């Protein structure tokens, strides 16, 4: 009997999957691969059903002969192992980023003469409703809040992009790329105080109050499912910080990052060019501990941002603070630098990891932007935040468009640079 292989990466079995099985049975015994959690995150979305439950769900489908684990988005390794006569899939993988997966399958099958079968993709109102329900569940606070911790345990490095509106949230949520035969997407979103302030036309001095910043979070949460890390600046007074923690936790935010400075906020990238005062270790530890005590769940993370390298206080001071902050209850450490060379960041990570192998390390490579995610992960970094790139890329484009319209007294000259209106309409889905 010939063997037919297909792979499912779903939390719910619907008529589309059953149609695949029905077609596959015409060609032979059906083997279904269940995509692992780690691979599912890179390819599709965070699973809402455990891997074990997904395996059981597929096992119970009539007509399935065997169920195996597929550990990678690409099929070449599982095809090499199983050598199926056929691989069957919906024809939606003929275009877009998924085409890379199909090309990978074709290449693997060619080695021994296997065949690929494309069946019409099933997407009707019933399937759309199922997808919508899954998205709604992923967006619920109790599911979203804990997802950052889960991702840290699953991913080599959690890729985080800055967002400051519902629209930028959609970009972070929906952008998937194919490069060098692999698919990738962002794992989490960063609500930056700099970018939030800039979008509102305000200076980055903690002028925008928490009520306004919470509205930004609401706008983003309304249209996304990915976990959110909140830029809490200094955290403010300890007496105020505990209320911020409680509010963010209730909303479903996954983490807050607070920096160990006091007084009027100045952006860290100014370094010693402006007066910036670093908080005492004792006082900042008290703030961290107070925040941890007020939490109602273990899901929410308080991450301590160390400014010692920014303020040229030295590596020893940075490490001393890191270990003290962890002892006070910090769930993670963010180390920052304004140097283009990442050497001091990597030195800190290596020295910290010698004594602490478990506490997550966060970096923001705005200045030292030549280093890759893989290199950071090799030095023990768990979360990388691209903290302002969407804002910084949008402003020059909008400014140039405004200038050209004024220059030519019409909009024709800018049209080639504009996103088609139909693409904007399709980006924002109706309920």
Can you describe what each PLM-predicted range is?
Residues 1-141:
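Nucleotidyltransferase catalytic core that binds NTPs
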Residues 11, 72-73, 121-124, 235, ...:
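Short, surface-exposed acidic/glycine-rich loop or hinge patches that mediate macromolecular interfaces
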Residues 35, 72, 92, 194, ...:
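Flexible loop residues that form catalytic
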Residues 58, 79, 130, 172, ...:
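Hydrophobic packing residues within well-ordered alpha-helices of enzyme cores
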Residues 60-62, 91-104, 115-121, 216-222, ...:
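Short, basic, helix/turn surface patches
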Residues 69, 89, 118, 304, ...:
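Structural signal for conserved beta-strand scaffold positions within catalytic alpha/beta enzyme cores
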Residues 136-148, 167, 389-431:
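Extended, intrinsically disordered, low-complexity segments
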Residues 141-366, 370-385, 393, 400:
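Alpha/beta enzyme core
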């Amino acid at each position: 009997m010939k063997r037919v292989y297909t792979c499912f990466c779903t939390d719910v079995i619907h008529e589309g999957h059953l149609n695949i099985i029905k077609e596959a049975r015409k060609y032979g015994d059906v083997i279904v691969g269940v995509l692992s959690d780690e691979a599912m995150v890179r390819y599709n979305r965070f699973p809402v059903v455990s891997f074990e439950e997904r395996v059981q769900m597929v096992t119970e489908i009539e007509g399935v002969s065997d169920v195996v684990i597929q550990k990678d988005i690409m099929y070449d390794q599982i095809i090499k192992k199983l050598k199926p006569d056929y691989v069957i899939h919906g024809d939606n993988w003929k275009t877009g980023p998924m085409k890379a997966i199909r090309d990978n399958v074709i290449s693997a099958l060619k080695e021994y003469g296997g065949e690929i079968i494309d069946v019409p993709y099933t997407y009707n109102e019933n399937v759309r409703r199922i997808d919508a329900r899954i998205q709604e569940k992923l967006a619920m606070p109790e599911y979203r809040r804990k997802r950052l911790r889960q991702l840290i345990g699953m991913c080599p490095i959690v890729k985080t992009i800055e967002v400051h509106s519902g629209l930028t949230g959609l970009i972070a949520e929906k952008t998937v790329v194919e490069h060098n035969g692999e698919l990738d997407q962002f794992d989490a979103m960063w609500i930056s105080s700099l970018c939030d302030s800039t979008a509102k036309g305000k200076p980055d001095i903690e002028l925008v109050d928490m009520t306004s910043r919470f509205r930004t979070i609401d706008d983003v949460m309304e249209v996304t499912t990915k976990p959110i890390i909140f830029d809490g600046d200094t955290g403010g007074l300890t007496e105020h910080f505990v209320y911020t923690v409680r509010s963010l936790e209730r909303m479903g935010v996954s983490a807050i990052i607070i920096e160990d400075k006091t007084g009027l906020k100045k952006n860290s990238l100014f370094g010693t060019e402006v007066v910036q005062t670093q908080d005492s270790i004792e006082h900042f530890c008290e703030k961290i501990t107070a925040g941890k005590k007020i939490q109602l769940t273990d899901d929410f993370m308080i991450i301590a941002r160390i400014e010692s390298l920014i303020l040229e206080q030295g590596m020893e001071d940075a490490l001393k603070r890191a270990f003290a902050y962890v002892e006070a209850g910090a769930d993670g450490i963010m180390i920052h630098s304004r140097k283009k060379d990442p050497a001091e960041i990597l030195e800190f990570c290596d020295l910290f990891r010698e004594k602490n192998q478990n506490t997550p390390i966060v970096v923001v490579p705005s200045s030292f932007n030549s280093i890759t995610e893989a290199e950071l992960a090799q030095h023990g970094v768990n979360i990388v935040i691209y903290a302002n790139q969407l804002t910084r890329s949008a402003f020059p484009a909008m400014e140039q468009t405004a200038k050209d319209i004024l220059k030519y007294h019409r909009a024709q000259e800018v049209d080639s640079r504009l996103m088609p209106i139909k693409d904007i309409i399709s980006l924002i889905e109706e309920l």
